[in-house]
Amino acid sequence: MGIFMLKEILNKIFWHPDYKREDFEVVILHRGAEENKKAISLDDVELKGNYLIYFDTYIPLHRILEIRNKKTGEILYKKK
């Protein structure tokens, strides 16, 4: 799955009425964090172009390692 598929998944979560952003989180590559990974609720970010905006931080989409449903544990995207 490339960036195109990743953006499709994110757009669906952000804009489709059947999905709630607060039910999902992204795991990103975050150097210095435990195992260099950090989980962020999609309710706390904005999607702008090829970036997630988390407060004042721009996170390039290529840093997303995983998208998962917090309630069910379902993994919608996992970087190879």
Curated annotation (Swiss-Prot):
Q: Which InterPro entries match?
A: MJ1316 (IPR040459), UPF0248 (IPR007547)
Family listed? Belongs to the UPF0248 family.
* Descriptive protein name: UPF0248 protein MJ1316
What organism does the UniProt record list as the source?
Answer: Methanocaldococcus jannaschii (strain ATCC 43067 / DSM 2661 / JAL-1 / JCM 10045 / NBRC 100440)
Q: Which cysteines are joined by disulfide bonds?
A: none
Q: Transmembrane segments in this chain: where?
A: none
